[in-house]
C-alpha cells in the first residue's frame, strides 16, 4: 500500500535510499542488527535501492550483505537468515562471538526522530523476571565473547580494527556487571 501510494504521488516508481546502517546521528553506536522494514513484494514497485552505510566499511558489511540479499530476491528475503549468513561470512573463525557482539549493538539509542530498532540484547530482559542468575550469565558471556573477538583479531584484522572500541566496552560492561 505504501509503495503504491508514494508511486502515485511521484508519478513514477520510487527510488529507495535506506538510511541504514549509517550512524552519523548516533555516533556512539554501532548498528549491527538485522536489516528489515521493507515489504517482500515491492520489487516491481521501485526503480532502485541503495543504502547509506556507516563510516566503518567492514562493520557496515553485516547490513550490506543483507541488503544485497534482499534486493537480489525480495520475495524470498529472510532478515534473520541473511543476517546469520553475513555474520558467518565476515567472521568465520568466531561467528558465535561476533553474533553476540552484533545482537548487542542494534539499537540507535535516543534520537531526535524517536526510531528504535528491535532486537537489542535479547537475553538481557530475562533477568527482570528471573532474578540475578540470567544477568550473571549475560555478563559472563559478554566478557567471554568480547575476549574471544579480541583474541581473534589476527583472522579479521580490518573488522576488529573498526569494532575494537565497542568490543572493549562490551568486555568492560560485562566485568562491571559482574562486580555489582
For the regions a language model picked out, list residue spans one by one.
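Catalytic-core regions of glycoside hydrolase
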Residues: 1-80
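C-terminal functional modules
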Residues: 76-180
Amino acid at each position: 500500500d505504501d509503495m503504491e501510494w508514494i508511486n502515485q504521488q511521484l508519478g513514477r516508481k520510487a527510488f529507495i535510499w535506506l538510511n541504514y546502517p549509517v550512524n552519523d546521528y548516533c555516533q556512539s553506536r554501532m548498528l549491527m542488527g538485522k536489516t528489515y522494514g521493507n515489504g517482500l513484494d515491492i520489487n516491481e514497485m521501485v526503480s532502485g535501492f541503495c543504502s547509506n552505510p556507516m563510516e566503518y566499511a567492514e562493520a557496515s558489511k553485516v547490513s550490506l550483505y543483507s541488503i544485497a540479499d534482499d534486493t537480489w530476491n525480495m520475495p524470498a528475503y529472510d532478515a534473520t537468515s541473511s543476517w546469520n549468513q553475513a555474520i558467518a561470512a565476515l567472521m568465520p573463525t568466531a561467528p558465535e562471538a561476533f553474533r553476540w557482539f552484533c545482537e548487542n549493538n542494534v539499537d540507535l539509542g535516543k534520537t531526535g526522530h524517536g526510531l528504535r530498532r528491535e532486537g537489542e540484547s535479547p537475553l538481557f530482559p530475562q533477568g527482570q523476571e528471573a532474578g540475578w542468575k540470567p544477568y550473571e550469565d549475560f555478563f559472563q558471556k559478554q566478557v567471554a565473547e568480547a575476549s574471544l573477538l579480541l583474541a581473534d583479531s589476527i583472522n579479521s584484522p580490518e573488522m576488529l580494527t573498526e569494532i575494537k572500541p565497542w568490543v572493549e566496552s562490551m568486555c568492560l560492561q560485562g566485568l562491571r556487571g559482574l562486580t555489582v
